[in-house]
Amino acid sequence: MKPTFLDFEQPIAELENKIEELRFVQDDSVLDISEEIARLQKKSLELTKTLYAKLTPSQIAMVARHPQRPYTLDYIQAIFTDFEELHGDRAFADDAAIVGGLARFNGQSVMVIGHQKGRDTKEKIRRNFGMPHPEGYRKALRLMKLAEKFGIPVLTFVDTTGAWPGIGAEERGQSEAIGRNLYEMTNLRVPIVVTVIGEGGSGGALAIAVGDHVNMLQYATYSVISPEGCASILWKTAERASDAAEALGITAPRLKTLGLIDRVVTEPVGGAHRDHAQMMTTLKRVLQDQLKEVQSKPMDALLKERFDRLMSYGRFKEDAA
């Protein structure tokens, strides 16, 4: 697949296009230009490292939304085996914006749940652009309760702009579905490991993100509202989205400092979309260590820590005047 470059990556795009041109010439020429290609590849790598070392929060938001970034089903296919998808909330419908089912992780039975976006237009519409309806969250809860019944851990993957705000979703109890998930996940008597792999948008993300260990990929985002939405409310224009992104503190390092996540998972140079295989290998190793850690703790201790984490969200302290 030909890489898609973001606006701030245009200098990289120009180098990569030059490399492709030279490769085409080399295939049809007796001249050996492999050294020149290698030199440009090295230059492209160094430029990518330089650009990504100083990304602004708004640029990180662009990376988190990259259309070639790995989605939940990509991680499931690469990290887990024997995945059996389970469908429906047993009340209204099967929401394709949430996927989940039984799988094996290093031979151990687990329940995997996550938001799922689409690649092409047809798939994006079917998945509702990764924005779940209430039935999606109720499906997720049904699978979590099933995991509790079987005594197997739950692993969730968060990647959504937010819960779907349509009239039908509100009529079917969107806020109740999200609130119910928060309540039930806090008391679920199995280990839960959460990973924010792309966008972590508001309650739509939090509804499957209450866990014992919360990871966040290096260029993922997690916030109460999108930068564009925040700017539209505060300044009546989405053009100040970069200011909003800075103020919201949407990046993984910032959230780690605030204690809202436990670990920042390093991405390949240029983001997870540049090297799916490397990203999968890194995350699998992280999940393996964390699952072993949380499973070694008494369940009552896990529940207390999980509850305390949820109650700490939104808490702040004012400095004395």
Swiss-Prot record:
One of its GO terms (cellular component) is acetyl-CoA carboxylase complex. One of its GO terms (molecular function) is carboxyl- or carbamoyltransferase activity. Its main location: cytoplasm. It comes from the Bacteria. Disulfide bonds: none annotated. Its EC number is 2.1.3.15. It catalyses: N(6)-carboxybiotinyl-L-lysyl-[protein] + acetyl-CoA = N(6)-biotinyl-L-lysyl-[protein] + malonyl-CoA. Keywords: ATP-binding, Cytoplasm, Fatty acid biosynthesis, Fatty acid metabolism, Lipid biosynthesis, Lipid metabolism, Nucleotide-binding, Transferase. Pathway: Lipid metabolism; malonyl-CoA biosynthesis; malonyl-CoA from acetyl-CoA: step 1/1. InterPro entries: Acetyl_CoA_COase_a_su, ClpP/crotonase-like_dom_sf, COA_CT_C. It is found in: Cytoplasm. It holds the Pfam family ACCA. One of its GO terms (biological process) is malonyl-CoA biosynthetic process. Residues 32-293 form the CoA carboxyltransferase C-terminal domain. Belongs to the AccA family. Component of the acetyl coenzyme A carboxylase (ACC) complex. First, biotin carboxylase catalyzes the carboxylation of biotin on its carrier protein (BCCP) and then the CO(2) group is transferred by the carboxyltransferase to acetyl-CoA to form malonyl-CoA. Acetyl-CoA carboxylase is a heterohexamer composed of biotin carboxyl carrier protein (AccB), biotin carboxylase (AccC) and two subunits each of ACCase subunit alpha (AccA) and ACCase subunit beta (AccD). HAMAP family: AcetylCoA_CT_alpha (MF_00823). PANTHER family: ACETYL-COENZYME A CARBOXYLASE CARBOXYL TRANSFERASE SUBUNIT ALPHA, ACETYL-COENZYME A CARBOXYLASE CARBOXYL TRANSFERASE SUBUNIT ALPHA, CHLOROPLASTIC. This is Acetyl-coenzyme A carboxylase carboxyl transferase subunit alpha. It comes from Chromobacterium violaceum (strain ATCC 12472 / DSM 30191 / JCM 1249 / CCUG 213 / NBRC 12614 / NCIMB 9131 / NCTC 9757 / MK).
